[in-house]
């Protein structure tokens, strides 16, 4: 997807600029799978999938932000990754001196809507990514949260970068600090401001479809193209923020 790795779907000038200033790896050997297992690998510097699945840092783990903190380097986390505040996913963020948690991604239980407008949501969203009958379901909060994300400034990843810039502005004259700016995007659902999507045309004419299923492809060709287009738009947002 990224130009620096041969992607041709869109232009990613800011990722290109970052690649020019970075070490670029042509081979990648996976450790633990993404989400919390990968984060435990990165905190502790060792592979966790050999003995445990999805879960928190253990009391015996050496966490690099904590090691920095205990050695007089100020550590700060900015993230909209809501799994940090879930049962089983916690104990990562509190290894930092401070943290700013941005709300509203995916199924983050953010906005309280006791009686959601069911018919409105059924018309607006594809049936494959909607479940409003079960408040415990993974799809329940996404349409609710999206009702409160109306402008580009409302998007959680945009708020993350603004918070990171605030940290840099506040601490530009300080030394010995570490900032971890971590966004949930481009994780699904592939929801980006309209200006990043408007140039990408598809033949799909149905309700909003931006959350692919974790299974074999059963969608029509038009639906697949719509999902791809929304993913490309989200990558474009990430490049813009970078």
Where are these regions (language model features)?
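Short beta-strand segments
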Residues: 1, 27-32, 77-80, 178-185
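Active-site-proximal N-terminal segment of extracellular/periplasmic enzymes that hydrolyze or transfer
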Residues: 1-23, 32
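Short amphipathic alpha-helical segments and helix-helix/interface helices
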Residues: 15, 62-66, 168
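A short beta-strand-to-alpha-helix junction
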Residues: 11, 30, 55-61, 225-237
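Active-site-proximal cap/lid insertion segments
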Residues: 1-4, 120-159, 165-241
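Catalytic-site neighborhoods of secreted/periplasmic enzymes
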Residues: 39-150
């Amino acid at each position: 997807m990224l130009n620096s790795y041969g992607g041709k779907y869109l232009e990613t000038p800011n990722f290109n600029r970052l690649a020019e200033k970075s070490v670029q790896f042509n081979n990648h050997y996976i450790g633990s799978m993404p989400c919390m297992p990968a984060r435990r690998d990165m905190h502790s510097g060792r592979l966790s999938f050999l003995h445990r699945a999805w879960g928190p840092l253990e009391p015996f783990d050496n966490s690099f932000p904590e090691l920095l903190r205990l050695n007089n380097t100020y550590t700060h986390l900015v993230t909209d990754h809501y799994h940090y505040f879930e049962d089983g996913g916690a104990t990562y963020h509190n290894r930092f001196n401070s943290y700013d948690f941005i709300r509203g991604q995916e199924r983050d239980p953010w906005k309280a809507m006791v009686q959601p407008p069911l018919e409105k949501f059924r018309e607006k969203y594809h049936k494959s990514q909607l479940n409003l009958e079960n408040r415990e379901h993974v799809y329940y909060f996404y349409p609710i949260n999206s009702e409160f994300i109306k402008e580009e400034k409302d998007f959680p990843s945009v708020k993350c970068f603004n918070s990171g810039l605030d940290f840099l502005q506040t601490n530009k004259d300080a030394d010995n600090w570490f900032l971890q700016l971590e966004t949930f995007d481009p994780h699904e659902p592939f929801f980006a401001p309209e200006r990043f999507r408007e140039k990408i045309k598809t033949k799909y004419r149905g309700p909003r479809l931006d959350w692919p299923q974790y299974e074999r492809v059963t969608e029509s060709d038009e639906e697949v193209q719509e999902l791809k287009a929304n993913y490309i738009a989200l990558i474009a947002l990430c490049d813009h923020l970078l």
